[in-house]
Amino acid sequence: MGKTYIVEHLDEELGQWSELEYITIARETGNFCLSSIPSTLVLPQELKNTPGFVAETRGVEEVYGQDPVLKARVCLLDPAAKQELSPEDGDLFDVFLFGGILGDDPPRDRTSELRKKGFTGRRLGPKQMTTDTAVRVTRIVTEQRIPLDDIPYLDFPELKFNEHESTQMPFRYVKGDDGKPIMPEGMIDLIRKDSDKAIDDLF
Protein backbone atom coordinates (compact mmCIF):
# COMPACT_ATOMS: atom_id res chain seq x y z
CA MET A 1 0.00 0.00 0.00
CA GLY A 2 1.26 3.48 -0.85
CA LYS A 3 2.26 5.83 1.92
CA THR A 4 0.53 9.11 2.72
CA TYR A 5 2.62 12.22 3.34
CA ILE A 6 1.11 15.06 5.36
CA VAL A 7 2.42 18.53 6.07
CA GLU A 8 0.59 20.26 8.91
CA HIS A 9 0.54 23.85 7.67
CA LEU A 10 1.57 26.04 10.58
CA ASP A 11 1.33 29.47 8.95
CA GLU A 12 -1.44 31.88 8.02
CA GLU A 13 0.18 32.38 4.62
CA LEU A 14 1.76 30.24 1.92
CA GLY A 15 4.81 31.75 0.24
CA GLN A 16 6.32 30.94 -3.14
CA TRP A 17 9.02 28.74 -1.58
CA SER A 18 6.42 26.55 0.15
CA GLU A 19 4.28 26.43 -2.99
CA LEU A 20 7.17 25.06 -5.08
CA GLU A 21 8.01 22.53 -2.36
CA TYR A 22 4.41 21.35 -2.01
CA ILE A 23 3.95 20.95 -5.78
CA THR A 24 7.14 18.87 -5.86
CA ILE A 25 6.03 16.71 -2.91
CA ALA A 26 2.64 16.03 -4.54
CA ARG A 27 4.23 15.09 -7.86
CA GLU A 28 6.85 12.83 -6.28
CA THR A 29 4.62 11.06 -3.76
CA GLY A 30 1.28 11.00 -5.58
CA ASN A 31 -0.37 11.15 -2.15
CA PHE A 32 0.27 14.45 -0.38
CA CYS A 33 -2.07 16.17 2.06
CA LEU A 34 -1.69 19.70 3.36
CA SER A 35 -3.62 19.79 6.64
CA SER A 36 -4.79 22.53 9.03
CA ILE A 37 -5.29 24.98 6.17
CA PRO A 38 -6.90 28.17 7.53
CA SER A 39 -10.25 28.97 5.90
CA THR A 40 -8.86 32.40 5.01
CA LEU A 41 -5.92 30.96 3.04
CA VAL A 42 -6.40 30.93 -0.73
CA LEU A 43 -4.22 28.20 -2.20
CA PRO A 44 -2.38 28.86 -5.48
CA GLN A 45 -4.20 27.39 -8.49
CA GLU A 46 -1.19 25.42 -9.73
CA LEU A 47 -0.89 23.69 -6.37
CA LYS A 48 -4.61 22.86 -6.25
CA ASN A 49 -4.39 21.43 -9.78
CA THR A 50 -1.37 19.22 -9.04
CA PRO A 51 -2.27 15.49 -9.19
CA GLY A 52 -1.72 13.83 -5.83
CA PHE A 53 -2.45 17.00 -3.82
CA VAL A 54 -5.23 17.07 -1.22
CA ALA A 55 -6.19 20.15 0.80
CA GLU A 56 -7.55 19.54 4.30
CA THR A 57 -8.86 22.18 6.71
CA ARG A 58 -8.88 19.72 9.61
CA GLY A 59 -5.73 19.12 11.64
CA VAL A 60 -4.01 15.77 11.63
CA GLU A 61 -5.11 15.15 15.23
CA GLU A 62 -8.74 15.41 14.14
CA VAL A 63 -8.20 13.08 11.17
CA TYR A 64 -6.05 10.40 12.83
CA GLY A 65 -5.90 11.14 16.55
CA GLN A 66 -9.30 9.79 17.58
CA ASP A 67 -8.59 6.16 16.65
CA PRO A 68 -5.64 4.58 18.53
CA VAL A 69 -5.07 2.04 15.75
CA LEU A 70 -4.88 4.74 13.06
CA LYS A 71 -2.79 7.01 15.27
CA ALA A 72 -0.24 4.24 15.86
CA ARG A 73 0.36 4.08 12.09
CA VAL A 74 1.30 7.79 11.92
CA CYS A 75 4.99 8.75 12.18
CA LEU A 76 5.98 12.30 13.07
CA LEU A 77 9.30 13.35 11.55
CA ASP A 78 10.74 15.15 14.54
CA PRO A 79 14.26 16.64 14.89
CA ALA A 80 14.01 16.01 18.65
CA ALA A 81 13.07 12.32 18.35
CA LYS A 82 15.39 9.83 20.03
CA GLN A 83 15.23 7.24 17.22
CA GLU A 84 16.39 7.64 13.61
CA LEU A 85 14.07 6.68 10.76
CA SER A 86 14.91 3.20 9.44
CA PRO A 87 13.77 1.01 6.51
CA GLU A 88 11.82 -1.13 9.00
CA ASP A 89 9.61 1.87 9.72
CA GLY A 90 8.11 1.32 6.28
CA ASP A 91 6.34 -1.68 7.81
CA LEU A 92 5.26 0.12 10.98
CA PHE A 93 3.79 3.31 9.52
CA ASP A 94 1.39 4.23 6.70
CA VAL A 95 1.36 7.99 7.25
CA PHE A 96 4.35 10.31 7.60
CA LEU A 97 3.71 13.68 9.19
CA PHE A 98 5.82 16.81 8.82
CA GLY A 99 5.42 20.10 10.66
CA GLY A 100 5.82 22.85 8.11
CA ILE A 101 8.12 24.65 7.82
CA LEU A 102 11.09 22.34 8.37
CA GLY A 103 13.31 24.62 6.35
CA ASP A 104 13.44 27.56 8.73
CA ASP A 105 16.90 29.02 9.19
CA PRO A 106 17.67 29.15 12.03
CA PRO A 107 15.40 26.21 12.87
CA ARG A 108 12.36 26.96 14.99
CA ASP A 109 10.72 24.10 16.85
CA ARG A 110 7.62 24.05 14.68
CA THR A 111 7.06 20.38 15.46
CA SER A 112 6.51 20.84 19.20
CA GLU A 113 2.71 21.21 18.88
CA LEU A 114 2.49 17.92 16.98
CA ARG A 115 4.86 16.26 19.44
CA LYS A 116 2.48 17.13 22.27
CA LYS A 117 -0.30 15.22 20.52
CA GLY A 118 1.52 11.94 21.10
CA PHE A 119 2.46 10.78 17.60
CA THR A 120 5.44 8.41 17.37
CA GLY A 121 8.55 10.38 16.39
CA ARG A 122 11.49 9.58 14.14
CA ARG A 123 14.52 11.69 13.28
CA LEU A 124 16.13 12.29 9.87
CA GLY A 125 19.66 12.84 11.12
CA PRO A 126 21.38 15.91 12.56
CA LYS A 127 21.17 18.39 9.66
CA GLN A 128 18.32 20.78 8.88
CA MET A 129 16.40 19.89 5.68
CA THR A 130 13.85 21.67 3.54
CA THR A 131 10.37 20.11 3.67
CA ASP A 132 10.56 18.53 0.21
CA THR A 133 13.99 17.06 1.08
CA ALA A 134 12.62 15.62 4.33
CA VAL A 135 9.78 13.94 2.42
CA ARG A 136 12.20 12.70 -0.26
CA VAL A 137 14.52 11.19 2.36
CA THR A 138 11.59 9.59 4.17
CA ARG A 139 10.44 7.97 0.92
CA ILE A 140 13.93 6.70 0.11
CA VAL A 141 14.24 5.12 3.56
CA THR A 142 10.76 3.64 3.96
CA GLU A 143 9.80 2.83 0.35
CA GLN A 144 13.18 2.09 -1.27
CA ARG A 145 14.51 0.62 1.99
CA ILE A 146 17.80 2.54 1.86
CA PRO A 147 19.22 3.44 5.32
CA LEU A 148 19.61 7.13 6.17
CA ASP A 149 23.40 6.92 6.22
CA ASP A 150 23.55 5.37 2.72
CA ILE A 151 21.74 8.24 1.00
CA PRO A 152 24.03 10.63 -0.94
CA TYR A 153 23.68 14.11 0.53
CA LEU A 154 24.96 17.60 -0.21
CA ASP A 155 25.25 19.75 2.90
CA PHE A 156 24.98 23.53 2.66
CA PRO A 157 25.61 23.69 -1.11
CA GLU A 158 26.64 26.92 -2.78
CA LEU A 159 24.41 28.00 -5.66
CA LYS A 160 26.34 29.99 -8.26
CA PHE A 161 24.15 32.29 -10.33
CA ASN A 162 26.96 33.87 -12.34
CA GLU A 163 30.61 34.81 -11.97
CA HIS A 164 29.88 37.32 -9.23
CA GLU A 165 26.72 36.07 -7.54
CA SER A 166 26.25 33.02 -5.38
CA THR A 167 24.47 32.03 -2.20
CA GLN A 168 25.01 29.23 0.26
CA MET A 169 21.94 27.23 1.24
CA PRO A 170 21.79 26.45 4.98
CA PHE A 171 20.23 23.01 4.46
CA ARG A 172 21.01 19.39 3.66
CA TYR A 173 19.82 18.12 0.26
CA VAL A 174 19.75 14.78 -1.52
CA LYS A 175 22.45 14.65 -4.19
CA GLY A 176 21.09 14.07 -7.69
CA ASP A 177 22.61 11.91 -10.42
CA ASP A 178 24.10 15.11 -11.89
CA GLY A 179 25.94 15.79 -8.63
CA LYS A 180 23.72 18.78 -7.82
CA PRO A 181 21.24 19.16 -4.96
CA ILE A 182 17.72 17.96 -5.81
CA MET A 183 15.48 21.02 -5.54
CA PRO A 184 11.97 21.89 -6.70
CA GLU A 185 11.54 23.09 -10.26
CA GLY A 186 11.77 26.88 -10.27
CA MET A 187 13.45 27.08 -6.85
CA ILE A 188 16.85 28.25 -8.08
CA ASP A 189 15.20 31.01 -10.14
CA LEU A 190 13.19 32.07 -7.08
CA ILE A 191 16.32 32.18 -4.92
CA ARG A 192 18.24 34.09 -7.60
CA LYS A 193 15.41 36.59 -8.02
CA ASP A 194 15.14 37.10 -4.28
CA SER A 195 18.82 36.75 -3.40
CA ASP A 196 18.72 40.13 -1.69
CA LYS A 197 16.13 38.79 0.75
CA ALA A 198 16.81 36.54 3.71
CA ILE A 199 16.08 32.89 2.93
CA ASP A 200 13.48 32.87 5.71
CA ASP A 201 11.46 35.57 3.92
CA LEU A 202 10.83 33.30 0.93
CA PHE A 203 8.69 30.75 2.77
Locate the predicted segments by residue.
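C-terminal accessory extensions appended to soluble enzyme cores
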Residues: 65, 143-203
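S-adenosyl-L-methionine/SAH cofactor-binding core of RNA-modifying enzymes
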Residues: 31-105
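Short, hydrophobic/glycine-enriched beta-strand segments
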Residues: 3-11, 96
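A short acidic, amphipathic alpha-helical/loop segment
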Residues: 20-25, 87-89, 113
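Short amphipathic alpha-helical molecular recognition features
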Residues: 14, 102, 106, 126-130
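Histidine-anchored nucleotide/phosphate-binding helix
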Residues: 14-30
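Structured adenosyl-cofactor binding patch, chiefly the S-adenosyl-L-methionine
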Residues: 112-161
